[in-house]
């Protein structure tokens, strides 16, 4: 019981740290964001934070979820919500619109993300 409480508090702390971290900005020389039309509608997400999987907060969170950081390709989005509407139109995403391969962790984390333009 105590271990479960500690794990829950630790996970909450990691999420708080990850959300408080600065947003991801693509490094120079990276490719332009993919158009939203090239992403399946169900995979479009609006994430508060997008970071490399190897960043400290994200790597810690992935470890808690039992995901090997080396297995993650692309970026990781934190606290994401689905983008609704045709082609992302009228989505109201003021954060980081991304297209993610794995959204199976609810709104907590999305894996294998690439930036998209809406």
UniProtKB/Swiss-Prot annotation:
Subcellular location: Secreted; Secreted, Cell wall
Signal peptide location: 1-20
Pfam families linked: Hydrophobin (PF01185)
Molecular-function GO terms, alphabetical: structural constituent of cell wall
CC per GO annotation: extracellular region; fungal-type cell wall
Keywords: Cell wall, Disulfide bond, Glycoprotein, Secreted, Signal
InterPro entries membership: Hydrophobin
Main location: secreted
Disulfide links within the chain: 39-99, 46-93, 47-80, 100-113
Residues with glycosylation annotation: 102
Induction: A CT-rich motif, which is often found immediately upstream of the transcription start point of highly expressed filamentous fungal genes, is present at the expected position.
Oligomer status and interactors: Self-assembles to form functional amyloid fibrils called rodlets. Self-assembly into fibrillar rodlets occurs spontaneously at hydrophobic:hydrophilic interfaces and the rodlets further associate laterally to form amphipathic monolayers.
Purpose of the protein: Aerial growth, conidiation, and dispersal of filamentous fungi in the environment rely upon a capability of their secreting small amphipathic proteins called hydrophobins (HPBs) with low sequence identity. Class I can self-assemble into an outermost layer of rodlet bundles on aerial cell surfaces, conferring cellular hydrophobicity that supports fungal growth, development and dispersal; whereas Class II form highly ordered films at water-air interfaces through intermolecular interactions but contribute nothing to the rodlet structure.
Family: Belongs to the fungal hydrophobin family.
Protein known as: Class I hydrophobin 10
Organism: Flammulina velutipes
């Amino acid at each position: 019981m105590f271990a479960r409480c500690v794990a829950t508090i630790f996970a909450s702390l990691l999420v708080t740290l990850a959300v408080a971290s600065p947003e991801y900005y693509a490094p120079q020389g990276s490719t332009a964001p993919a158009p939203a039309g090239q992403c399946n509608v169900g995979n479009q997400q609006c994430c508060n934070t997008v970071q490399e999987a190897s960043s400290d907060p994200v790597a810690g969170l992935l470890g808690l979820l039992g995901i090997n950081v080396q297995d993650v390709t692309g970026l990781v989005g934190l606290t994401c919500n689905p983008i609704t509407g045709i082609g992302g139109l009228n989505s109201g995403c003021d954060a980081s619109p991304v297209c993610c391969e794995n959204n199976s962790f609810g709104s907590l984390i999305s894996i294998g993300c690439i930036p998209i333009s809406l």
